[in-house]
Amino acid sequence: WIMGHMVNAIEQVDEFLNLGANAIEFDIDFDKDGIAQITHHGIPCDCGRKCTKKAIFTEYLDNIRQVTTPDDPKFREQLVLLALDLKLQRISSAKAYRAGEDVAKKLLDHYWQRGNSRARAYILLNIPLVEDYEFIRAFKDTLKNEGYESYNDRVGINFTGNEDLDKIRDVLEILGIHKQVWQADGITSCFARGTERLKEALEKRDTPGYNYINKVYAWTLVRKSIMRRSLRLGVDGVMSNNPDRVIKVLKEKEFADKFRLATYNDNPWEKFRG
């Protein structure tokens, strides 16, 4: 999975897909009451990027629904995964539950259209810190209460704050989540990061019977040397400001026979068995 990073303006969706991304990540900004308002990162952000691009969240969902719906004029077959980077660290943890309710309802109304949409992308909920886990509980409660619990099959969980992996496991255990879990490891492209935690996550992913990590991705990679390093370690995905660079690396002799781009037929919740 090649995730286009910080795709917050509607016009950026095609831009990143044209560069080779098959997944996009966008930031969701909330008001003080936990209501999702806009797709927006803000300052600071990655080096060399404009931090202020934005869209109304519901309008963004309406557009991305079309982009991921077969036979729609805007349909792009390659886009199979949407990563929602939830900026919960900007609001009180007490509002995390309200935020989870709101995002679930907006997805129901504007993406899935309560069963009337054929939009097919998988959804990855990126939670910044484990202290905000009530967002996940609220999201699942809302799908159940609204009568659309089946959409849980389309939704995965990912904690992005580089916290202790055992601490993350404990929170997932509290929530009763034993599947559909991704684990991110990374840092803004402005800085270098070692591989110790990334290797630990990959080791846990590959441990038989360990159900708290199904996929691992590294972020935000812009240098080809770091992309190669991550691929050699065996990541499932790369988040990048430059998907075209990832494509070029994947075509190199060392990787061409080991990796391919994920398609809609690849289940993002299953561990890869090579």
Curated annotation (Swiss-Prot):
What is one term from the GO cellular component aspect held by the record? Answer: extracellular region
Q: Does the keyword Repressor apply?
A: no
Query: Main role?
Result: Dermonecrotic toxins cleave the phosphodiester linkage between the phosphate and headgroup of certain phospholipids (sphingolipid and lysolipid substrates), forming an alcohol (often choline) and a cyclic phosphate. This toxin acts on sphingomyelin (SM). It may also act on ceramide phosphoethanolamine (CPE), lysophosphatidylcholine (LPC) and lysophosphatidylethanolamine (LPE), but not on lysophosphatidylserine (LPS), and lysophosphatidylglycerol (LPG). It acts by transphosphatidylation, releasing exclusively cyclic phosphate products as second products.
**Record's protein name:** Dermonecrotic toxin SdSicTox-betaIIB1bviii
Catalysis performed (reactions): an N-(acyl)-sphingosylphosphocholine = an N-(acyl)-sphingosyl-1,3-cyclic phosphate + choline; an N-(acyl)-sphingosylphosphoethanolamine = an N-(acyl)-sphingosyl-1,3-cyclic phosphate + ethanolamine; a 1-acyl-sn-glycero-3-phosphocholine = a 1-acyl-sn-glycero-2,3-cyclic phosphate + choline; a 1-acyl-sn-glycero-3-phosphoethanolamine = a 1-acyl-sn-glycero-2,3-cyclic phosphate + ethanolamine
Q: Report the domain of life of the source organism.
A: Eukaryota
Q: Which UniProt keywords apply?
A: Cytolysis, Dermonecrotic toxin, Disulfide bond, Hemolysis, Lipid degradation, Lipid metabolism, Lyase, Magnesium, Metal-binding, Secreted, Toxin
Tell me the GO BP annotations in alphabetical order.
killing of cells of another organism; lipid catabolic process
GO MF annotation terms: lyase activity; metal ion binding; phosphoric diester hydrolase activity; toxin activity
> Does the record's keyword annotation contain Metal-binding?
yes
Enzyme Commission number: 4.6.1.-
Record-listed Mg(2+) binding positions: E25, D27, D85
CDD domains with a match to the protein in the record: GDPD_like_SMaseD_PLD
Active site residues per record:
H5, H41
- Alphabetized InterPro entries for the sequence: PLC-like_Pdiesterase_TIM-brl
Using the UniProt record, name the top-level EC class of this enzyme in a single word. lyase
Which cysteines pair up through disulfides? They are: C45-C51, C47-C190
Which family does the record claim for this protein? Belongs to the arthropod phospholipase D family. Class II subfamily.
Species this chain originates from: Sicarius cf. damarensis (strain GJB-2008)
UniProt note on tissues of expression = Expressed by the venom gland.
Cofactor(s) required, per the database record: Mg(2+)
Cofactor binding note: Binds 1 Mg(2+) ion per subunit.
Location within or outside the cell: Secreted
